[in-house]
Amino acid sequence: PVGRLDVPIPAEDPLTLAKNGSLLANLINQVQLEASGADISLTSLSNRVVDFPQDVTVRAIVSAYAFPNTLQTIRVTRAVLTAALERSLSYFDFAPDGSLCISDTFLRPIIQHFNYDYFSGLTVTADLYQPVGRRVRSIVYQGRELPDDQTLTLCLNNYRASGAGGYGCYKSCPLVSEKLTEISDLVTQYVLQHR
């Protein structure tokens, strides 16, 4: 093992993770924030979420973060964050019986759980009963509503920074910095340093 967590992180179904948050996404976001020095971070999980053991191995890290992505930091506005959050919130829909479910656009023609993003450093209030594109109600950064004219640095993987997955809002954002180390290697280094 390269390190040990306080507790193992069990795999859960994608809808539960999207509703309640993910300890694994929290860990990856913490790694990205430390590696980049950015204000906020986002990450996504693969379509197949696996258990993450308490005794962490390189194999477990690579299984949990299977993408060969590198880390980029970009400068974003509230408008960009709102567009990105709206895209992520479009993951949610309602079944005919009124229960929360995953939108068909993330399930067909291919499964795209990896296009739901988990943010760190923001407190977001959303109303899922509103139409897609009008769900974000509040974006709070450091205890205050984020003003329209304030910019933040956001660390994310190079795939998402390219606008992939329906996140074209990031394509025109200025690049602040880039790390060419794969994110799975950054996670390994982080666990080694903080075990």
Predicted regions, residues:
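Glycine-rich phosphate/diphosphate-binding loops and the adjacent beta-loop-alpha structural elements
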Residues: 2-23
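Feature captures C-terminal
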Residues: 26-195
